[in-house]
């Protein structure tokens, strides 16, 4: 009975993982194809089209890697060699970091575009794509240095006799790190998450403030009373706040869980896979 219940739970969790990944791959593929099609048709691109397409591409690669890892976690009998194990886990963590970084920079870029000409940020409008590109490259190098420990810690599971391995998939595991190394990487990851999430939150608040000011000025110029129908500014504000609030909430929750799992030693369990693969 317990075996049947465990098998049922495993199948249920596997289907949930693949459904989530499938929805993400479909959505990002459609978004990327849409922007590619618009570019091929010769439509004049907006300033945000290239960053949005780039974010969709990063998410697509990350989700494809996640599908490969999930397949090995639930279905494979363990067939990765040392190079495949290190490369797949490293690339997945790297692209997940780029996903958070690119989404944050997209939020900053949108805030710069919306800023009025009288703002100090208006000077950055023309050069912002280049400056944000340099900043993105810097963060990519920083994330690579943080994730480099995977190239040492990740090993294939076959023919390994270590007791305290942290199992990632059926084919790949993590060697236990020393307490000082764990706290070092946890501190770096926490600093990264606090910085990126904080910057995204500030950008969201700035955009919300600009939209509220624009709505107030429009009503004053038109001498109109509040209409029960939502204005374009209100709809844009609700959309921005809803999306960013959800992203910030999930990122914060994921960071807390990842940090908590990292500082707890001696608990080698397969449930560490989502946080170990995505941190």
Swiss-Prot record:
Residues 1-19, 71-93, 156-159, 209-238 are extracellular. InterPro entries: GPCR_Rhodpsn_7TM, Vmron_rcpt_1. One of its GO terms (molecular function) is pheromone receptor activity. It comes from Mus musculus (Mouse). The keyword Glycoprotein applies. This is Vomeronasal type-1 receptor A8. GO terms for biological process: response to pheromone; sensory perception of chemical stimulus. CDD domains: 7tm_V1R_pheromone.
């Amino acid at each position: 009975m317990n075996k049947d219940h465990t098998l049922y739970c495993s199948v249920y969790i596997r289907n949930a993982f693949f459904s989530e990944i499938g929805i993400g791959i479909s959505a990002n593929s459609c978004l990327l194809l849409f922007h590619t099609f618009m570019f091929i048709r010769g439509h004049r691109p907006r300033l945000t089209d290239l960053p949005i397409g780039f974010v969709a591409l990063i998410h697509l690669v990350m989700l494809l890697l996640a599908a490969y890892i999930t397949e090995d976690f639930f279905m494979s009998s363990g067939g990765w060699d040392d190079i495949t194990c290190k490369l797949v886990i490293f690339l997945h963590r790297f692209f997940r970091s780029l996903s958070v970084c690119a989404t944050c920079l997209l939020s900053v870029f949108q805030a710069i575009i919306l800023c009025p000409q009288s703002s100090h940020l208006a000077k950055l409008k023309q050069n912002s794509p280049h400056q944000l590109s340099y900043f993105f490259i810097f963060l990519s190098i920083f994330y690579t240095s943080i994730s480099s420990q995977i190239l040492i810690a990740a090993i294939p599971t076959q023919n390994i006799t270590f007791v305290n391995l942290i199992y990632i998939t059926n084919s790949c595991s993590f060697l236990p790190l020393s307490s000082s190394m764990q706290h070092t990487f946890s501190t770096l990851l926490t600093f990264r998450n606090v910085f990126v999430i904080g910057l995204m939150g500030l950008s969201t608040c700035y955009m919300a403030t600009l939209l509220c000011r624009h709505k107030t000025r429009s009503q004053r110029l038109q001498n109109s009373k509040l209409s029960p129908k939502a204005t374009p500014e209100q709809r844009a504000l609700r959309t921005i706040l809803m999306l960013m609030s959800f992203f910030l909430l999930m990122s914060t929750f994921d960071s807390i869980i990842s940090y908590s799992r990292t500082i707890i030693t001696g608990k080698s369990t397969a449930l560490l896979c989502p946080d170990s693969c995505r941190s």
